[in-house]
């Protein structure tokens, strides 16, 4: 039953997106101009001719790859930063690491992600022959880690202090207590917030084209530069982003329902 419901929901979403695309296209097309291309001709010119749709396919693929691996990097680095800051707050230890972590969070959260991307590509990796996708993953991973660190830290602080005392009474070292008892509870509490961070990250990757990488937005821009038609490529890009975000949001809501029920 749930599979059938999901399939019907996906079909309704596809039809809705298609209807929006068609309605906007019809409204934006001047009917009075006899020499104006028809919708079909414009669609063919923008996406079918010279296989231009492949720019969007390649762009979507790169966008998803960057998002997934940047999120993984952000989770690992963010968890380490959150643990360092929590240990310092609770034990007063790791003062130097905590100072570095606070400086990192201040710099990353206080500067635009686009500037960070440009610095990493044109300054840090200026003399290194490296593919563009890994550069973007590093840039967005470092950016995402700063926000994920605070999310995880908030989740750790939300765990009752008695859990730390329980681990200590069992003779477990602080690190083992943190990894085996505290973090699993914290992750469960903040999982929806982490998923939402992934959605934000997906949209932030739209600036990847500034370093010459063909992401989804850049793919649409390439089509525009070849056809001199801005409407269809950019609307297609917007609808693809919208579709992906709506699907991810749907799964996040289902996840929240399951977590609240457990």
Language model features with spans:
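Transmembrane alpha-helices and adjacent helix-loop boundaries
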Residues: 2-16, 21-262
């Amino acid at each position: 039953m749930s599979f059938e419901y999901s399939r019907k929901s996906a079909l309704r979403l596809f039809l809705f997106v298609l209807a929006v695309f068609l309605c906007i296209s019809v409204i934006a097309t001047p009917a009075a101009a006899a020499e104006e291309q028809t919708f079909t001709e414009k669609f063919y010119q923008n996406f079918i001719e010279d296989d231009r749709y492949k720019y969007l396919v390649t762009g979507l693929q790169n966008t998803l790859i960057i998002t997934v691996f940047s999120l993984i990097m952000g989770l690992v680095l963010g968890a380490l930063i959150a643990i360092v800051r929590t240990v310092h707050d609770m034990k007063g230890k790791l003062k130097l690491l905590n100072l570095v972590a606070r400086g990192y969070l201040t710099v990353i959260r206080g500067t635009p992600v686009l500037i960070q991307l440009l610095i990493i590509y044109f300054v840090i990796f200026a003399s290194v022959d490296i593919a563009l996708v890994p550069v973007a993953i590093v840039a967005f991973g470092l950016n995402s880690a700063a926000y994920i660190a605070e999310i995880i830290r908030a989740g750790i602080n939300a765990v009752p202090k008695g859990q730390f005392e329980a681990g200590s009474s069992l003779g477990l070292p602080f690190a083992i207590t943190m990894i085996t008892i505290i973090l699993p509870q914290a992750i469960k509490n903040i999982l929806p917030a982490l998923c939402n961070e992934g959605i934000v990250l997906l949209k932030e990757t739209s600036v990847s084209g500034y370093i010459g990488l063909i992401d989804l937005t850049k793919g649409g821009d390439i089509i525009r530069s070849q056809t001199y038609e801005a409407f269809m490529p950019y609307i297609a890009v917007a609808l693809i982003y919208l579709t992906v975000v709506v699907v991810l949001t749907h799964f996040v809501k289902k996840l929240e329902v399951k977590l609240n029920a457990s």
